[in-house]
Amino acid sequence: MARREVDDSYTNGSVVEVVSIEEGSKMDKEDDHQNPQAPDGGDVVVCGMPMSFTFLQMLLAEFLATFFLMFAGLGAITVEEKKGAVTFPGVAVAWGAAVMAMVYAVGHVSGAHLNPAVTLGFAVAGRFPWRRAPAYALAQTAAATAASVVLRLMFGGRHAPVPATLPGGAHAQSLVIEFVITFYLMFVIMAVATDDQAVGHMAGVAVGGTIMLNVLFAGPVSGASMNPARSIGPALVGSKYTALWVYILGPFAGAAAGAWAYSLIRLTGDRTD
């Protein structure tokens, strides 16, 4: 019933995009045999827990890609605030371009989730094993925190502000906006990352363009987070937790709903009128 496909595109190039929950439960055992470079038949021990070498590679890819994304996006905001040289549309382009680059860079390795909400969406849709989701979310959040620390040290030291997401109006308004734009983002991701009838090689452009559009119209209202890691990282570094719940609840709910909605309307066979 489960199947694994190999392809260079973002859609099918990663285990996380094409592996069902049933096969996901077998992945660790398969990795043990497929990775003779890892010690003890494929398992390595991290914090007292055995993990397959392949999964550690996936986690490292997620960490690095999320770090570079946050460094570019948060860095653009920081430069704009300090120098006024980027402009608001430039910030939107920076986020979208960074996402696009990372999708093409590590999509075939880890799936380029870059976002705990996206990981949740894939899990809800049966496209990612639930038991691996917490490790992905932890790697993504750690990367966002690390990027925030580096930017803070680069632009003023430990007392420098970190670009946080804050509501531009009522908390309820920002919550709704975050839900809607993350729903929109996850809906697009599901289309290009899981549907064989979509143009997979354009996935980076589609996802990056969606991010850019969302930032352009939702940025002044909610900050256009769409990503709990993006909000949690700067909040931890800056010790500012105002309305943080908005940027956790909204994206998680939106991604889950977006993944479910696309699964509902997805064409699974030949279309008949």
From Swiss-Prot:
<keyword id="KW-0677">Repeat</keyword>
<keyword id="KW-0472">Membrane</keyword>
<keyword id="KW-1133">Transmembrane helix</keyword>
<feature type="transmembrane region" description="Helical; Name=6">
    <location>
        <begin position="245"/>
        <end position="265"/>
    </location>
</feature>
<feature type="transmembrane region" description="Helical; Name=5">
    <location>
        <begin position="198"/>
        <end position="218"/>
    </location>
</feature>
<feature type="transmembrane region" description="Helical; Name=2">
    <location>
        <begin position="86"/>
        <end position="106"/>
    </location>
</feature>
<dbReference type="Pfam" id="PF00230">
    <property type="entry name" value="MIP"/>
</dbReference>
<keyword id="KW-0813">Transport</keyword>
<comment type="similarity">
    <text>Belongs to the MIP/aquaporin (TC 1.A.8) family. NIP (TC 1.A.8.12) subfamily.</text>
</comment>
<dbReference type="GO" id="GO:0015267">
    <property type="term" value="F:channel activity"/>
</dbReference>
<dbReference type="InterPro" id="IPR022357">
    <property type="entry name" value="MIP_CS"/>
</dbReference>
<feature type="transmembrane region" description="Helical; Name=3">
    <location>
        <begin position="133"/>
        <end position="155"/>
    </location>
</feature>
<comment type="function">
    <text>Aquaporins facilitate the transport of water and small neutral solutes across cell membranes.</text>
</comment>
<dbReference type="GO" id="GO:0016020">
    <property type="term" value="C:membrane"/>
</dbReference>
<protein>
    <recommendedName>
        <fullName>Aquaporin NIP1-4</fullName>
    </recommendedName>
</protein>
<dbReference type="InterPro" id="IPR000425">
    <property type="entry name" value="MIP"/>
</dbReference>
<dbReference type="InterPro" id="IPR034294">
    <property type="entry name" value="Aquaporin_transptr"/>
</dbReference>
<dbReference type="InterPro" id="IPR023271">
    <property type="entry name" value="Aquaporin-like"/>
</dbReference>
<keyword id="KW-0812">Transmembrane</keyword>
<feature type="short sequence motif" description="NPA 2">
    <location>
        <begin position="227"/>
        <end position="229"/>
    </location>
</feature>
<feature type="short sequence motif" description="NPA 1">
    <location>
        <begin position="115"/>
        <end position="117"/>
    </location>
</feature>
<feature type="transmembrane region" description="Helical; Name=1">
    <location>
        <begin position="59"/>
        <end position="79"/>
    </location>
</feature>
<feature type="transmembrane region" description="Helical; Name=4">
    <location>
        <begin position="174"/>
        <end position="194"/>
    </location>
</feature>
